[in-house]
């Protein structure tokens, strides 16, 4: 719990401005409970399932929506705090690559960073244009919830996180999410579904350096985690509100990147889903 309090102080420090707190904390919480404010969606899916392509399609179809992409560049280039004499920051390493190369050593560190970066994104103030819009939408590429119930959970189950690391992670994860509960509420999940084999093919095609050591077995594990949560409903969730969030399942087995007809179908399903939220 001490770790949770320390992280909480750091987060609160980033939102210290009285004006910002007045705009973000109470009104945002009231808006969420009153049914007002932006609809908050999260896109979930396996590694290389096509989330980035889908996000670009969403942004093209709905330029009025605010879309927050996954902060991969931050994970690939960890910078030391404070500037050096020349005004630059010291580069500490590529944590994404380090995690894949030595999962037993770096998984806890990586999951701490990934959770904190997602949390900060989801806590960012609502832009004025969204507050003024009649029907505004915020979209997040993955969430603080999948960080725990998909990725960290899987790393624990495959032995990359120790018992004590998993216990500590869950402790401060629960503490922080309870502390910021009103500001992290989601109205819907969009689950992009494809087989591990399809994801493996797309992973090879995008040829990201850090992912060259990923094996099919790992994608199969993550696929099972997604299916257990979004399809089979067997994942034990510790936040009651999360258990009732609607899920739109989109089959993205077929490559839709240059298929206009399939793109139209997918966006039609999204629009129908949004109307029912």
UniProtKB/Swiss-Prot annotation:
Keyword annotations from UniProtKB, A to Z: ATP-binding, Cytoplasm, Kinase, Mitochondrion, Nucleotide-binding, Transferase, Transit peptide
EC number in record: 2.7.1.113, 2.7.1.76
Residues reported to bind substrate: 70, 100, 111, 118, 142, 147, 211
GO CC, alphabetical: cytoplasm; cytosol; mitochondrion
One Pfam family recorded for the sequence: dNK
Record has Ribonucleoprotein as a keyword: no
Annotated function: Phosphorylates deoxyguanosine and deoxyadenosine in the mitochondrial matrix, with the highest efficiency for deoxyguanosine. In non-replicating cells, where cytosolic dNTP synthesis is down-regulated, mtDNA synthesis depends solely on DGUOK and TK2. Phosphorylates certain nucleoside analogs. Widely used as target of antiviral and chemotherapeutic agents.
Protein family: Belongs to the DCK/DGK family.
Name of the protein described by the UniProt record: Deoxyguanosine kinase, mitochondrial
